[in-house]
Amino acid sequence: ALSDDAINAWRDRINKAPQLKNMYLTKGLVILDESTKRDEWLDHPDTPIPGTTPFEERPLIESDFYVFNANDSYWLSDPKKPTIGYSPLYGPTETPRSIRTRMNIHLLEGLDGFDFRGEDGLFSVQEIKDALMDNSGLTAHLLKDELVDQCQQSPNILINDISIDLSNACSTLRDWDNRYNAESKGAVLFREWITRYNYLSTMYTGDLFAGSFDKENPTTTPLGLARNERNLIALAEAVTLLDDNGIPLDVPLGNLQKAHRAGTTYTVHGGNRYEGIANLQVATTSQSGSSGRSYIDSSIFSGSNERLGDSETLTSSGYNIVHGSSFIMTLNFTEDGPSAEAILSYSQSGSSSSEHFSDQTE
């Protein structure tokens, strides 16, 4: 826990130093001044661990409707009643949310056509499962049509004095339904396009989004594609990568997105954090960090860590899934008691000789 004086001094500091503010907004880092006792942790007699925050000073969110979280701060865990006023150690508020958080709210609130609720306005077990596994991507929903329009207006782009024809790319994206199902054609091309941007571009106005963030409308802002040449250059780079590796632009996602376990591959549907999807499936990345590992080091992994060109996540064995929607459970309180359904996507056993090594993965 921090004192009010320490928090106020920290707020003054980050308002004067953009680097410190950026570290907080993007990494969750609260940089304190070690030279002053003011910034030392406070001990409270009612906390079992010295220096921690008393329970009554922590965010506690209750709702008659729902609460949720998608690896963001507490601010929009109940989007009907945004919560503020707690220590900055619990994360930023009134700032842009991840595209995945925004998609979850779209699904829960039935926004912009993403309505899976019944006539009663509530979710049955089947309806919530349908919402989770719909596999629609919000970034595609928000940006793809404008990208296709820009592509059709300028179907040729120069890269290193080589003309790249984007006509087939335009058609592939136009015909894609913005989903990340195993059979989805266009998902791979869009992924190779959007992952050429910094992940933070999916949250903030700038390289991807033209519209400004509005804290009064955090679920629907920012929006609108930033129209610039970079969009088509990134698309041409994605086309070149796939062409150079003999991968059709309309390859079904399931042909590439796999879980590799002891010599057997399993097709996995779902999308990554750039794509704004409830069913998160994370592949190894070209850079280690919170988004995944740069390689898989496991005795049961039978894929390849060889990166294809400059792709963020594509290897010679496809998109190697390492984590994401791993334990999924739905629970319904019925007149006969709780009724639950659950799945562990990586299966229960790590022993390849066990019958439970890959049964749930399959």
Feature map (PLM): residue ranges:
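C-terminal/peripheral segments of proteins
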Residues: 1-141, 149-152, 162, 168-362
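Short, mixed-charge amphipathic alpha-helical segments
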Residues: 157-158, 164
